[in-house]
Structures are given as structure tokens and as C-alpha cells.
Amino acid sequence: MGEPQQVSALPIPPMQYIKEYTDENIRKGLAPKPPLPIKDSYMMFGNQFQCDDLIIRPLETQGIERLHPMQFDHKKELRKLLMSILVNFLDMLDILIRSPGSIRREEKLEDLKLLFVHMHHLINEYRPHQARETLRVMMEVQKRQRLETAERFQKHLERVVEMIQNCLASLPNDLPLSDGAVSVKTEPMDVREPCTDHHAGPQEAAAASLKETTIDKDAAMCVIIDEMT
């Protein structure tokens, strides 16, 4: 039995479009430019909209009768609309039982439609508040994550500083050479007489002195590593 194929929740992007946005085309500046912003009007779901239209248009501009006053409490009006929808729905059921062909059936349908339009309109007026609240919560989550990351980093930093301080405190003032450390020759070196070679003598002496200093530093570092481990 083969492995189950993963199905994407979104449709596959059109290949004739995405193939133009390769890394090479983007690097060479050959990728298509984004479309220009719409300035006048646009079509959406078969309706024409103006760019300067309000996000939530008043009911009067849509030719819909307003059932609630201009100044109102959204919570109270939503509850009133919910109760009105319930009462009209029960009336609709009673009409369908007693006289299905009555003209009152169409009237109740229009009443229910108007009530639902008002309820959706009042809910949509909460969308800007919902967007601001969602953004606020998202920023609070990001802030909390960054503070937690900074706190963990500070703890690791303090731990590293403490380890370094403990290592420095454990080091003696006079570092002795361990048994496995590199031994340094203490015998005097044979230095040629200046009369035999005027140029090689000082250079060889300087090189030997530098080598001896390097060996001392290497030996001290070996001692430090041995004590840490």
C-alpha cells in the first residue's frame, strides 16, 4: 500500500504565472511587475465598487429600511433582532400549517429577510473592532515570545559568565607545568660568535626567543584545559 498523498487545502497556483518568478528572472529584473493600484472602481462578485466607498455602507444607501435608531446599543439591538426573528419564524410555521398559499407567507419571508439583513449589518459593524482586537492579541503574543526569548538568552549569558568566572578563580597565580605539558629547554643556547656570521646570529637568537615564548604560552594553555576537564 502506497503512502497517502497530501492534499492541499488551497488550489495549485497557475504554472504559467509562477514560472515567470524564478530566482534568475528576479535577479535579472525580468519578473513581471505587480499590478498598479486601483484608483477608480472595480468589480467584485458581479457588483461595481468605488475605491473611496465606506467599508460598511449605511443601510439607506443600499435602499434598505432602517429598523433601529441612529444612536443605539449594539448588544440590545442584536438581542431584539434575535427575538424578532424567532417570533417571525414561529409565525411563518403557523402560516405554512394553516394556509400555505396565503399572501402572508410572502410577507413573512420579506420580514425575515429584512431582519437577517439588519442582524448581519450590525455584526459587520463589529468587524473593525474585531480586527483591532485580533491585532492587539497578536502583538501581545509576539511581545511575550520575544520577552521569553530575551529572558532565556539572559539566563544562558549569566550561566556562561559564571562558568568563566569560576574557571578564572580556579586558576593559580603561578601556573605550573603538568606532566603531559610540553617541556621547555632551559639550557643556554649555543650562539655563534658575531665574527663568524654577522647576519645569522641575531636572527637565530630572536627566532629562538620567540619560539621559547610560544612554547611557554602553549604549555600554560594545556594546563588550563587539563584543569577545566
Swiss-Prot record:
<comment type="similarity">
    <text>Belongs to the Mediator complex subunit 7 family.</text>
</comment>
<dbReference type="GO" id="GO:0006357">
    <property type="term" value="P:regulation of transcription by RNA polymerase II"/>
</dbReference>
<dbReference type="GO" id="GO:0003712">
    <property type="term" value="F:transcription coregulator activity"/>
</dbReference>
<dbReference type="InterPro" id="IPR051669">
    <property type="entry name" value="Immune_Mod/Transcr_Coactivator"/>
</dbReference>
<dbReference type="GO" id="GO:0016592">
    <property type="term" value="C:mediator complex"/>
</dbReference>
<keyword id="KW-0539">Nucleus</keyword>
<comment type="function">
    <text>Component of the Mediator complex, a coactivator involved in the regulated transcription of nearly all RNA polymerase II-dependent genes. Mediator functions as a bridge to convey information from gene-specific regulatory proteins to the basal RNA polymerase II transcription machinery. Mediator is recruited to promoters by direct interactions with regulatory proteins and serves as a scaffold for the assembly of a functional preinitiation complex with RNA polymerase II and the general transcription factors.</text>
</comment>
<dbReference type="InterPro" id="IPR044888">
    <property type="entry name" value="Mediatior_Med7_sf"/>
</dbReference>
<keyword id="KW-0805">Transcription regulation</keyword>
<dbReference type="InterPro" id="IPR037212">
    <property type="entry name" value="Med7/Med21-like"/>
</dbReference>
<comment type="subunit">
    <text>Component of the Mediator complex.</text>
</comment>
<keyword id="KW-0804">Transcription</keyword>
<dbReference type="InterPro" id="IPR009244">
    <property type="entry name" value="Mediatior_Med7"/>
</dbReference>
<dbReference type="Pfam" id="PF05983">
    <property type="entry name" value="Med7"/>
</dbReference>
<protein>
    <recommendedName>
        <fullName>Mediator of RNA polymerase II transcription subunit 7</fullName>
    </recommendedName>
</protein>
<keyword id="KW-0010">Activator</keyword>
